Each structure stands twice: as C-alpha cells, then as structure tokens.
Amino acid sequence: MGMNNIRSIIRMIILESVGVQGFKMIFLAGLPGGGKSTLLKQLGIQNQFTTCNIDNFFEPKLMDELGTKNLHDFSERFFDLRAIRDGRSLTPEELEEYEGVKALRGKERTLFRAAINDFKAQVNEICAIGSNFIVDGTAANYDQITSDAERFRTAGYDCAMIFVDIDVETSKERNLQRGREGGRAIYTGIIDDQATRLPGHLEPYREFFGDDRFFLVPNKGTFDEYKENIEQIRPGINAFMGA
C-alpha cells in the first residue's frame, strides 16, 4: 500500500472522529512579541491544533551552526560597518570585522532557507494526513498568505486569521529583550519593514477571510486590557470552531 493511500485512510478515520465539521486552520499573525502564545492559552484552543512555526526549525539550526539565536547584534554591526564603508575605506580591523559579520549573515540566510523547507514539509504532511493546525508568523506577505489559504481551502480546510496588533516600538523592545535573555532576536530593521506593510494588509485580510473568520486583537495597552480584548473574540472563535 502506497504512502498516499495510507494517508487517505488515516484522514478518513480522523474525519469520522470529528464528524462533519472537518478541519480548521488559523493564521496567527502580527509583529514579534505580540503575546500570541498568551492568546492561545487564554482561549484554550492550543491543544486542538498543531502549531507550525519556522522558528521551531530555525532556532536549533542557529544554535548548532552559529552558537546563538541573537541575530540582531551582528546584523546591526554589519549595517553600521557597511555605512562606514560607503563613506570611507574601512581600517584593516574594521574590514576583518565586516567580513566576519557578513559571513554570519550569509550562514543565517542559508539556515533560514533550510528551515523554510522543513516548515513547508511539516505543513504539507499535516494537510496530507488531515489535522487542525496553526501557522504562527507575521503575515507581512499578503500574497503568500492568501495563496496558502486558497491551497488549504482546496484541501478542505476552514481557514481563519487572528491578528494581534502591537505597537512597533514595543515589538522591537521585546525582541531585543528576548535576545538578551538567550532567545531568538531578529534584526529590528526587519520589524520596522514589517510594521510599514502590515497596516495596509488588515482590511484586505478582513475582506479575504470574511468578518466571521478575521479576528483583530489590539495589544497596545495594559496586560489586563489585552486579556479583555482576547475575550472579545471568544464568541467568534467558538463559532468558527463549531462551524
């Protein structure tokens, strides 16, 4: 029996176990440090989904190859030195440092491409077998997200998006703090770029997913206010899960 046939049988068994509701997938979107794990925990749905996040594959590769998950520091130094180079010749010491951080950025890109391939393989495997899943990311690339959503819909998934709206400066500070504590920190310039693109995507996302499948959760105040905002989407999430 081929692997595709085995997957089809498993899929039918799971479909029978969940009844006519079928499978759900959620794009969990927003800038880094938005409190997305808090949202899932408060809603109590995290155990009903497999969470797919490139970081799950990227971070181990970073530690194995670079010995750090803090990508901000050497990236910032790279751009600082490049700016100096554009104005004058680098000293021998600066040139050596520049080549070093440039090499680190090259390794980072190679590792990220490998992590993307692993991430895509995980998503494809879940779709082939059939299971609820969450794609955790920023959703800054509108065309990619909507293309993926169409593919998941074709595979029989009911798709939604939860977008956590956080202030860009708060996102950058939490990103840097995570790096200081040994976690992964991306170059803050990436967050600035994402923050300029995301606001223009919100209404298109709402139109694409529909009012009953797009949930915007502001997180620009106190933690208690954020928890209250999460509660505001609970009825809609419950309706989505039960549809």
Residue ranges of model-derived segments:
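Phosphate-binding P-loop
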Residues: 17-23, 125-127
